[in-house]
């Protein structure tokens, strides 16, 4: 709305137009060249370019290096396997994005298709995208407002701005007000002058906020950190090994070949694919619970969320007005008040207030009685008189009216005592978040104030329990709404969220005036239970402030106004019946109404996270174990403990069965979880070095007691690395003793056992290597599993020292 009220002539002068003739066609064309089309610009990326982008990032480079190294040393089987892993990772990511609706496209579709415009003195229908500032347009009931329009002629409009501002009730507009692009006309008809089009509209600025909202997931950061750690470690160790071997006079070609194979084994090429598949399977589980995952990394983000910002209207509440406790006055009964109000309502108008009153009449069994009355004349609500009125006949004739309490008091010529009483009631209702409606009846030659009907948007039936469960999961829930503070406080109290509700608009004014600093603003936002009088840019700011305080933030919403914050949040959740724009901006889309399904989604996300963390610890442990053992054997003993072929077989047999980790049974964490890289790397390194010790011990046993040849020793060590490696996953999969519940899933257990058996047959029978026989193979089974118990003890000591749950 204008800060200074302008008259029609001033507005015409401002926009160089006339409400009598509109713009000329030529002038409209000129302005179209200046301002562009009234639409949301669409940034299109060719699908091939988008697909190739999945192979141009640090994670992909890591895998591509491994593939190139494999090709250089002509290990074609390894080369093909790595390429498959690379493609799996790329295809999963591309398909996930391809299926997800484009945010900008949906926001564009939200724009009105056609508009009634006055050009060259004639009214005509044109595509809404051709509107320009200064155009004179006509909007009426049922229209989607095609641009930001200054209303200059007509009685009034009632528009639904809930998808834009979050206000639960339609808003009244009069001359001088602005009807915003994307809002829906519920009542009335007015003429206006186009103020802004496209991205310059209030709606368009929302799009800019969506485009501005960019985020890098903690999953991506974790992958890069682990990749950097392992690659740097591998490069340093391999460089030392190559230097020492060349100093010893070994063949450059032979040394380089082994070094390249070792480098390939050190790069966790399968890690992104395994983690993507784990998240994809988790996404399927969530889909069964009516939560559609659009971006796989959102699962990992949701597991770590510690603050949930929930939109109020339609998410925590029904977005449907209902009547509170009826207050009857002047000797009238509650039934009388509802009867009079119902007679002053029309069902066919589908007005939110009228529907609430008629529903209350149905509850009180008054509908049959109402049918006996005949409405002779009905005066609908308008912003000028602020009430409805009906002339009614039955056995007698009388009038009824409902509207703003102050207006009804004036209609009744109420005395001071009644006015004071009604005003006290209205003030008390307002403090508790209710809107008040006055009701009067005209009998015996005068109007009588019959009573007051409180109205409010009630919480969903499932909301209080959902809020309680979310809190039990260690997640703080904050309510966000465009409604006034009193309404927000009432709903927050009813839901058990808390009553520390602040007006974000007032807080931002203080920030702008310099009364508080940015740090203080962020602190107040962090401590608040909820926010009232919120606009789209405010929601974005709220999420940003919480993120700056170190929180992982989830945001639920259903309207266009929620889209920027949904995109900015670590995990954006579009609830059931959300607008296309909200769905497009979100990471997760709920199909069931309310937020109860979020409880299931958080629990499932945490289970998925546990599986991912187990695999990450396992993968780092194995890389360290093999790298250090091979390196030290070469440097200290001058022996290659395994061949290049064995390293390739290890890579295949170790990673393929571990895909089953996606189906493993896990303990659900009771609080938000995050990638604790320090703890993960310390635990992995300790278990990896323990594996190095156990490998040297078996090396010693083989040489001193078993007197194996070098070829047999290599086969023996190969079997040890496979069996002990697979035993590691049983150690890392649970933060308790490995024999405690939950037990491994059947798929994981038999997947591991199957590859263990294959590895045993290969070593015992001498396939691709020297045979060691079944006696030594069985001995190795016993040795590997005894050491598994030792590793489990090391794990428990470290978990206690590092205070990891």
Curated annotation (Swiss-Prot):
One of its GO terms (cellular component) is plasma membrane. The keyword Mitochondrion does not apply. SUPFAM superfamilies: Calcium ATPase, transduction domain A, Calcium ATPase, transmembrane domain M, HAD-like, Metal cation-transporting ATPase, ATP-binding domain N. It is found in: Cell membrane. Its main location: membrane. The keyword Acetylation does not apply. Keywords: ATP-binding, Cell membrane, Membrane, Nucleotide-binding, Phosphoprotein, Translocase, Transmembrane, Transmembrane helix. Its EC number is 7.2.2.-. It catalyses: ATP + H2O = ADP + phosphate + H(+). Gene3D superfamilies: Calcium-transporting ATPase, cytoplasmic domain N, Calcium-transporting ATPase, cytoplasmic transduction domain A, Calcium-transporting ATPase, transmembrane domain, HAD superfamily/HAD-like. It is an enzyme of class 7 (translocase). One of its GO terms (molecular function) is P-type proton-exporting transporter activity. It comes from the Archaea. CDD domains: P-type_ATPase_H (cd02076). The chain crosses the membrane at residues 53-73, 75-95, 226-246, 258-278, 615-637, 641-663, 680-700, 712-734, 747-769, 773-790. The active site is at residue 311. It is a multi-pass membrane protein. It holds the Pfam family Hydrolase. One of its GO terms (biological process) is monoatomic ion transmembrane transport. Belongs to the cation transport ATPase (P-type) (TC 3.A.3) family. Type IIIA subfamily. PANTHER family: CALCIUM-TRANSPORTING ATPASE. This is Putative cation-transporting ATPase MJ1226. It comes from Methanocaldococcus jannaschii (strain ATCC 43067 / DSM 2661 / JAL-1 / JCM 10045 / NBRC 100440).
